[in-house]
A protein has these predicted regions:
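Feature captures the catalytic cores and cofactor-binding loops of soluble hydro-lyases/lyases
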Residues: 30, 34-198, 212-256
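A structural signal for short secondary-structure junctions
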Residues: 196, 203-204
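Short glycine- and Lys/Arg-enriched binding-loop motifs that mark or flank ligand-binding interfaces
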Residues: 20, 148, 204
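Buried hydrophobic positions in well-ordered alpha/beta secondary-structure cores of metabolic enzymes
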Residues: 24, 140, 200-202
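Channel- or pocket-lining gating/hinge segments that regulate access to a cavity or pore
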Residues: 207-210
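A short, compositionally biased micro-patch
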Residues: 153, 204-205
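Short acidic, Pro/Gly- and aromatic-enriched capping/linker segments at domain boundaries
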Residues: 1-22, 31-35
Length: 256
């Protein structure tokens, strides 16, 4: 068994135009990530919907840092309810590959700058706490302060809320993670109604989280920039009395 199947990652993301890391993930350039921080959820959704990516958004989160915008490259991991024989095979793979610590550490240990941990935990909160303060601190250090999205819970909320990371989770519980097995790192995961692939650009806002395929990331930021420029021009012309709000809101004439 191979928890992190590099070849499979490359096959699943073969339409990405970008370089890849050692795990096969597409690496959307830092410049695009920086520009993505100014994109609204609605702007990103509009581009994705136009390309028939209709199930890339998930809402209804407990957002520990609503004043922060989360942007980064997805590192995915998937848990399943614990079954003894599967659990034993996974831990044998971990020993064979020198993985240190508990299974909740393994995906965190792969994180690099500007990565976002995306955890499929089938909505489990009690005993589904993907991180606490120690792992949250490790995420902050390894990523430079991005964060995580977990379809499950976290613990140590009072301490985690003080870390310089964004956290989107389903809830908080004092228990430790238990009764689950990590079966895959950097494979497809289901987060609510969305399918996420490793290397997707994660955009988390007060609205929710949207997952942008790498091949569409540049189009998303360019469309957003055009929208902001149009909005700025329209507001300026309205304030100057040149155009009315009705003229600005409709399709623009050649003169405009």
């Amino acid at each position: 068994m191979e928890l992190n199947a590099t070849k499979r990652v490359a096959e699943l993301t073969s339409d990405s135009p970008y370089d890849r890391d050692r795990y096969g993930r597409p690496l959307v350039p830092d410049d695009i990530l920086e520009r993505m921080t100014k994109v609204t959820t609605e702007e990103a959704w509009g581009v994705l919907d136009g390309h028939d990516y209709k199930l890339q958004f998930e809402g209804g989160w407990a957002n520990l840092q609503p004043q922060r915008i989360l942007v980064g490259r997805a590192v995915t991991c998937r848990y399943v309810p614990q079954r003894p024989d599967v659990h034993d095979v996974v831990h044998e793979e971990a020993r064979a590959n020198g993985r240190a610590g508990e299974q909740s550490c393994w995906a965190v240990d792969t994180l690099e700058a500007a990565d976002v941990l995306v955890v499929e935990l089938f909505g489990k909160v009690a005993c589904g706490t993907a991180i606490g303060y120690a792992l949250g601190s490790a995420i902050a250090r390894r990523t430079g302060g991005t964060g995580l999205v977990v379809d499950g819970g976290i613990r140590d909320m009072q301490q985690v809320a003080g870390l310089p990371i964004s956290v989107f989770c389903r809830g908080v519980h004092p228990s430790v993670i238990d009764g689950v097995t990590l079966v895959e790192i950097n494979g497809p995961v289901r987060i609510g109604r969305a399918t996420v692939l490793p290397g997707d650009v994660v955009l988390g806002t007060p609205t929710g989280v949207i997952f942008v395929p790498p091949k569409l990331a540049q189009e998303v930021v360019e469309q957003s920039e055009q929208t902001r420029l149009r909005d700025y021009f329209g507001k300026m012309r309205i304030s100057e009395g040149v155009y009315t709000p009705g003229e600005v809101d409709r399709a623009w004439s050649d003169d405009m």
